[in-house]
Structure formats: structure tokens, C-alpha cells
Amino acid sequence: VTNAQKKQPKHVMMMAAGTGGHVFPALAVAKELQQQGVEVSWLATPSGMENRLLKNQNIPIYQIDIQGVRGNGLLRKLAAPFKILKATLSAMRYMKQLNVEAVAGFGGYVAGPGGLAARALGIPVIIHEQNAVAGFTNTQLSRISKTVCQAFPNTFATNEKVQTTGNPVRKEITEILNPSWRYQEREKAGEPLRILIVGGSLGAQALNERVPEALKQLNVPLNVYHQCGQNHAEITLARYEGKPDQLNVDVQPFIENMAEAYSKADLIICRAGALTVTEIATAGVAAIFVPLPSAVDDHQTANAKFLANSGAAKICPQATLTSESLKEILAPLMNRQLLSEMAAKARQQAQPDATQQVVRLIQEL
């Protein structure tokens, strides 16, 4: 047994809460740790979606009560230090009780008290930031963490503890075939260009409203697969009325199999959440990003630039998103050879082994 093997942490506590963007990468890492025989537990908030996402995952959940402490009125600001202290003490209790040997924070407010608790107990902390602009909690925790993982380069100031790992993504997406081959096969088969529109689980209204009109004006044969979110299917389909016959449209509230949707698409129009951008790079698909304008610190634009700067994607800010402006971006892209080149550039930016990289860094703590 080498020295390194002896030292590997036997019990790792994951800290991720609030949104799928934090929880899914943490879950990918947790599953990989479990496969390697490491015991895993999860620090969560009582009402967070992580509780639902972790159902049937065979990971014990420990809850601490902490609400967001950024903004939200004077009283909450005054109460915040007491809430944080109470939550930190709860987290310390769990960590002692479980004999936690390493703590991995993936964002969400739960990671703040969790990181402080680990620090107070002398347990090493590693954090992972999914976005190109670090969130509030991770910015604070980066100072006390032993290792800092960033999905995109330049999120944190460079120093020896910062590692660019990429974002952990689902296995089905890392297994998608090479883009050059996929695009070439579609070209050989004489298939019309296939455009995928992803509005996210809620459906991005800006995309549902403006994209159909732009596509109707393009006047080229297209197969369009438009995911519009729950309750928006009828109205979105109605916006395609009066379309030319060569525009084939399939409107769906949800896409069950994202890996299949990516692999069949020549071009995707979507938001620029961290995981979406990472999945598009991993799959290798040309993209037009419409960043969510309300995202904290405009982090979606920063995420989108990661692919746009290398020529793999275009950015259309929501403020200037009209059917006309979108048509102007789309028209020159109606060429599969060009889209194939963009897809190849996207794939060059991918880090498909992100999960393994983060797991290795946890084991080296």
C-alpha cells in the first residue's frame, strides 16, 4: 500500500443545495466516490430541491437550516450571523458524529456554514465552481479551501491551489460520437439542418416568443425540435403557424433524452447555464446562446463567452433579441460545413474526464 492510498479520505461529505446546477455535478462526483469504496453523506437545506434529486440515490442526507444571506431586508441581514452560527454548529455536530475526513462544496448557501464547520474541525475543504463567475459562497470559501476546482479557466485568480477541471457531466453525454462524423453522416444522407431549441425545464419565454418567427423567415429546409417547457406547448406551436412547408417542427414540453437530442442537432439555441455550456462542449454542437439576463453577476454571459471566444458559438443578448436580430445571426449559419467546424471547436474545449479529475483531487486532500 503506497502512502497516497493510505491517506485517502474514508468519508466525504458533499455540500450542494438550491439548484440542479450545483447538485448534479456533486452527485456525479458522489457516485464515483461510492464506486471507489468511499463513504459519502450530503449536507442539505430542509426545503431545497436537493432532497428530491437525491431520493433513491443511497446517500444519507443531513440538513442544516440556512436561508440565503445575500440581500433580503434589514431584519434578515441582522439575523444572518446568528443563523450562520447555528447552522455551522449543526454541521460540526454531524461531521464529528460521522467521522467526516473531507468536505466537498459545490455551491448553494449550505456550503457556507458547512465549510466553516469543516475549517473549525480541521477537516480539509475542496470546492468546485460550475460557473465562469464564482458564486457568493464559493468566493468566500475559496480562501479557506485546500483545493479550488473551477469549471472554466480564469474564474479564480491563478495560484497553486486552483485547478481547472471542467464540470462533471452525465456519462451519456461523454459517450456521444465525434461531431465531425455526426455532421458528415447527416450531410451524406441529405438531411435538412436540424435545429434544437432548449428553453430549460421552465421554458425560456424569450426563446418561445422570438425563435419561431425568425425560423419562419429563413426560407431553407429545416427540422426543428423545440423544447418549450410545461404549459407552453400549444402557444409555442401556434407561433409556427403560416410556416413554409420545408420547415418541419416538433414542439415538446420536455426532452427526456438530452444526449440523443444533442447528438442529432446541427445547431442549438439555448440559455447559457454552466451545465448547458459544458454539455454542449462535451457533445460538440454549434450553439447560439441567449444568456439569462437576471443571472447573478451576469454569469451566463461569462459562461457563453467560453465557447464564443473560440468560435464555437454566437451570443445574442436578450436585450437585443428580436426575430429580426436572430434571423441575421442564423442566416449565415445555414451551412452544415460551417456548423460542423463550430461543433469541432466546441468539442476541443471539453473536459470529459471532469468527474474523475475532481474525485482524484478529493482523494489527494
Where are these regions (language model features)?
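An amphipathic, basic-hydrophobic alpha-helix
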Residues: G73-A102
